[in-house]
């Protein structure tokens, strides 16, 4: 076990260096004076894009080699550090003494360690100044993150083996990068693979250990992204702790929900990129709420988040589109303003170009598309993706073909002979038309037909979405909270009109719409709509959105509390709320169990 603990620590250190420390040092002038949220979003998106672009570009020129990547990354890092004049003079002075024989190796290394210690102390002092007055809040967030990492790492430490069959495929693709071959199985978003390849090259961490532990560690980035989004859009900054606590403790009852949660244990592209879904939405909202013109920092981070999502996995980009649309629909007037529309379109185009250019060039050079990218054709043809449910839905509703039901060819011919001929059907249809025309049945008004269609669709979404995923009892509670959220949204709109004489950009409406829209996407096959994303893949973000929607009443209470003298105790109350959720889930027997691990092979 000690070996695996050491490997876990190595993966964690490599991840922190590559994802956060390297860009923080190299781009420190740009990040100087920026908020912690900006720094987090910048580092977690720009680092992925730079690594992806560098590795794939070297591969396109057939010069991808670990030694080149090693010298480029460490060379840029060291050169950036030595840009500081005082540090450069000190290091050069120490080196001159070392080579002149005036300083021994031990003394040189001791001086280097002292300098590193000084830099670390300075960093933590600055960080302490940043979080001054909010230590309890960040303490709660840190505990939740550590809890999540421990929970999602449990399976890997128990089995020391990949928990999902697809991980062996991704292992092979990363090994292809080690051999200098990009897109070894065809053109496919490879940002995650390039990231793990770089960890292997820069730190000597095996691909196996990276794939085994990176996904669980990367959960921290997902939770921080969720934290940043809901801290921005909710009225109180303390409500988000309740959302995260509920997400990490409450059990799920449907196999699709369990599958969605279990995927966070695995290092696979979609889950690696889920954090960009929330960052895209965060910076689009900030962009729409701004008063300035031009291409600002908010739009830049929206662009990098969009580009990172495309570079990691296309499903994440599709989810980001629907989540952004849920909020943007309530700010259409801001989108189509002259000062916003042009730069927003430019940012989207740049994001798409940055992320897809290596893939487009690889495809143009003759590398074929990877097979899973045919999902678009599957939708057009009405056939299933690997995890799709379209044909299963047809089977359950009586629309399946004889091939789907396994009926033999002989039985098929017997059934065919018993069916009426086409001429008989035409005759019967003509008779029915004549009867209808002779009886003069009044036509149903268009409004009523539309209303009936909407009601029928809502019932199907409830039946094949809420009920199927959460059961009758929980689905009932979700419906009640959705109604409460809608009422609170209307109340806030009325207050905004009365006080500000305008309709404000409604965040509550966006949360409620997003939770329903993702449920609609899940139930799409049952409504006769194409299954754009495999239903089980939607369950994780949907769970977060539903919990956020249910937290809207608590957010209002926190907001009102902060307007009173008792508002000083809001952090302590949020801590009590987190503890109450943990205790309550255990007391009522709804605390989550351990997630399943699919052992296709055992180490």
Which residue stretches match the model-derived regions?
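Active-site lumenal/periplasmic loops and adjacent helix-entry segments of GT-C-fold
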Residues: 127-275, 541, 598-602
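Membrane-helix boundary/interfacial segments in multi-pass membrane proteins
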Residues: 60-69, 157-167, 182, 204, ...
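Signature aromatic-anchored transmembrane alpha helix within multi-pass, membrane-resident enzymes
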Residues: 344-355, 556-593
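Membrane-interface alpha helices of multi-pass inner-membrane proteins
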Residues: 298-314
């Amino acid at each position: 076990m000690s070996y695996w603990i050491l490997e876990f620590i190595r993966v964690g250190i490599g991840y922190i260096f590559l994802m956060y420390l390297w860009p923080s040092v190299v781009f420190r002038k740009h990040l100087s004076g920026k908020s912690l949220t900006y720094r987090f979003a910048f580092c977690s998106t720009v680092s992925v894009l730079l690594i992806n672009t560098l590795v794939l570009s070297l591969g396109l020129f057939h010069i991808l080699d670990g030694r080149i990547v090693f010298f480029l990354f460490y060379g840029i890092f060291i050169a950036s550090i030595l840009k500081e004049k005082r540090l450069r003079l000190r290091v050069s002075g120490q080196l001159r003494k070392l080579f002149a024989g005036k300083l021994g190796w031990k003394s040189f290394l001791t001086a280097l360690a002292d300098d590193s210690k000084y830099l670390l102390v300075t960093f933590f002092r600055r960080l302490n100044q940043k979080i001054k007055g909010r230590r309890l809040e960040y303490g709660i967030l840190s505990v939740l993150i550590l809890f999540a990492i421990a929970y999602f790492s449990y399976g890997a430490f128990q089995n020391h083996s990949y928990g999902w069959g697809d991980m062996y495929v991704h292992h092979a693709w990363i090994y292809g990068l080690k051999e200098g071959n990009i897109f070894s199985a065809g053109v496919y978003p490879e940002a995650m693979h390039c990231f793990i390849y770089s960890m292997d090259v820069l730190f000597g961490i095996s691909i196996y250990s990276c794939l085994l532990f990176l996904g669980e560690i990367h959960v921290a980035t997902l939770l921080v992204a969720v934290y940043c989004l809901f801290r921005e859009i909710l009225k109180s900054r303390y409500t988000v702790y309740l959302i995260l606590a509920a997400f990490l403790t409450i059990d799920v009852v449907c196999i699709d929900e369990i599958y969605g949660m279990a995927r966070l244990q695995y290092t696979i592209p979609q889950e690696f990129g889920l954090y960009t879904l929330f960052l895209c939405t965060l910076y689009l909202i900030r962009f729409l709420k701004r008063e300035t013109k031009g291409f600002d920092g908010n739009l830049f981070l929206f662009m990098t988040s969009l580009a990172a999502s495309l570079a990691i996995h296309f499903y994440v980009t599709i989810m980001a589109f629907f989540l952004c649309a849920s909020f943007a629909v309530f700010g259409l007037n801001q989108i189509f303003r002259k000062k916003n529309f042009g730069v927003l379109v430019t940012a989207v185009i740049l994001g798409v170009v940055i992320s897809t250019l290596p893939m487009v060039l690889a495809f143009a050079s003759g590398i074929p598309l990877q097979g899973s990218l045919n999902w678009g054709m599957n939708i057009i043809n009405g056939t299933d993706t690997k995890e799709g449910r379209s044909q299963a839905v047809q089977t359950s509703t009586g629309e399946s073909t004889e091939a789907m039901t396994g009926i033999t060819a002989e039985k098929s011919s017997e059934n065919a002979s018993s069916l009426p001929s086409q001429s008989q059907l035409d005759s019967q249809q003509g008779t029915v038309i004549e009867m209808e025309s002779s009886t003069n049945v009044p036509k149903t008004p268009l409004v009523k037909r539309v209303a009936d269609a909407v009601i029928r669709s809502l019932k199907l979404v409830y039946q094949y979405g809420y009920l199927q995923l959460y059961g009758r009892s929980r689905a009932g509670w979700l419906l009640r909270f959705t109604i409460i959220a809608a009422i609170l949204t209307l109340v806030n709109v009325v207050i905004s009109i009365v006080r500000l004489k305008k309709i404000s950009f409604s965040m509550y409406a966006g949360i409620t719409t997003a939770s329903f829209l993702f449920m609609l996407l899940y139930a799409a096959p049952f409504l006769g709509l194409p299954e754009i994303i495999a239903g089980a893949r939607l369950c994780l973000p949907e769970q977060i959105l539903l919990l956020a929607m249910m937290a809207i009443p608590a957010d209002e209470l926190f907001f009102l509390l902060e307007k009173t003298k008792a508002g000083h105790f809001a952090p302590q109350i949020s801590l009590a709320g987190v503890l109450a959720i943990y205790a309550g889930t255990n007391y009522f027997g709804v605390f989550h169990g351990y997630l399943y691990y699919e052992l296709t092979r055992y180490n």
